[in-house]
Amino acid sequence: MPQEIAPIAVRPSTLSGISEQMVVSHYENNYGNAVRTLNAVRRELATLDAGTPPHRLRGLKREEHSLMGSVALHELYFGNLGGFRRAGPNSGLGRPDWHEVPDAFAAEITADFGSASAWRREFVRTAQSLAGGSGWVLLTYSRRQKRFWNQIATDHSQAAVDAAPVLILDMYEHAYHMDFGVNAAAYIDTFFRNINWEAVLKRIATTQNDRPPLNEDPSSTTDTPSLSVEELAAHIANGSGVQIVDARQRDHMSRHVDLMAGATWRDPDRVEEWIAELTPDKPVAVYCAYGFDVGCNVTKTLIERGFDARFVRGGVAAWYASGGARALRPTAG
């Protein structure tokens, strides 16, 4: 089955020193392109036969491997961001200066690095060695050797056997150039200020106990009916008459001129004023910016009023990342 777009696991507007614009561009363009290209490569692989030249098969399999790595590493990278608003002096997950690692993390890595400070110095130096170039820096845990180490992955596909990355830093220039230019050192420092240590510690526990990878999709915590952007695209293609509601907050809409093609913007704070404009016997798909609370809450209200409503996982950002069509808002056109 095709690789689906994973909803972004962090609220881009909550990061400290990293702009929402850069994170969204990274997600929609770079991550989205990796998913779309992976699906295209797999479609081509499915058409090959015994007459396919060996070099063509070899090239496609290498490309598939690299793209699989890019997709996974991007998802993990976004998933370990967002700690600035979660951690604090009294949370047990951070320190007042935002530069010390939490005690629980230090306890995990000290045996392999000597101290948390020594780990951080090596991780930072490794990242700085990639400045101006490209690649990933990973803190990886080897299940076979029962130890952590920092590694470089320069083409998305340099993964160790039976090992799992638990902290990921994207050092490709697209990850920081928009905000930091060539100042990779400032980006690395800002990255540390935004690490979601809670997510990192959960990954460590999952890996060490040989449990399946965590589902870091923010919509996985609700039982409100939902659909993926791929499922929404199928509904549209099948002519189901789905009504698409853009429920992004007014202040968010004031900064954007586009919306999903076929959608109508509705103020999420004034559902009672526009709900009568919907057709009761047709399905409704509701999306917000990134698939967190807003679209989910509007969907709950519509369901309570008898509508067959679902919220779109990942919001409009996931739709754009999938290559979905967009249109100008009527007021902006």
Task: Specify the residue positions occupied by each region the protein language model found.
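Active-site flanking residues adjacent to catalytic metal/cofactor-binding acidic residues
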Residues: 172, 245-247
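Rhodanese-like catalytic fold shared by cysteine-dependent sulfurtransferases
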Residues: 209-242, 250-285, 290-333
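Feature for soluble, non-membrane regions of globular proteins
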Residues: 1-217
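Pocket-edge structural micro-motifs
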Residues: 7, 152, 246, 268, ...
